Amino acid sequence: PKRAKNTMSTESTSIRIPVLGSVPAGIPLEAIEDIEDWEEIPREWTKGDKDYFGLKIHGDSMYPKYMDGDTIILRKADDCESGDECVVYVNGYDATFKKVIKKMDHIILQPLNSEYEPIMIDNNDENNPVKIVGIVVELRRKL
């Protein structure tokens, strides 16, 4: 009798990434121990040395698109396009998740929830530097 060929690849098409409960500043993402969960992403996303992590949303500043308890998948990045939704450090250690709007002389960290005020940061303000940590590529919500 003919044997069925094994068409399953030995290499998995997905990889596991950590979902962090928070993004404390000053610690390389690889060293953070506040891992709440694990998510799988397509292996092809990581081509070209791209790195990803997940983050649990705490709070409602990005409601209604993102809700408390949602998981966002982010691509690590140190820059972004204006309009990207990013996790950023403000003043070196406060991590926040906002829409980043780049203007000529300042950056606006825009919450999606109108109950919250946007944060405006002057590009020349050395006391409040904005550092991009990651750009949202996917939202995952448990029903």
Residues covered by each model-derived region:
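Short, positionally conserved secondary-structure boundary motifs
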Residues: 1-68, 95, 102-106, 129-130, ...
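Structural motif
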Residues: 70-71, 84
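Hydrophobic beta-strand signal
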Residues: 73-74, 87
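Short, Lys/Arg- and Gly-enriched loop/turn segments at beta-strand edges
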Residues: 80-87, 96-98
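SH3/SH3-like beta-barrel fold
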Residues: 88, 109-112
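Amphipathic alpha-helical interface segments
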Residues: 114-143
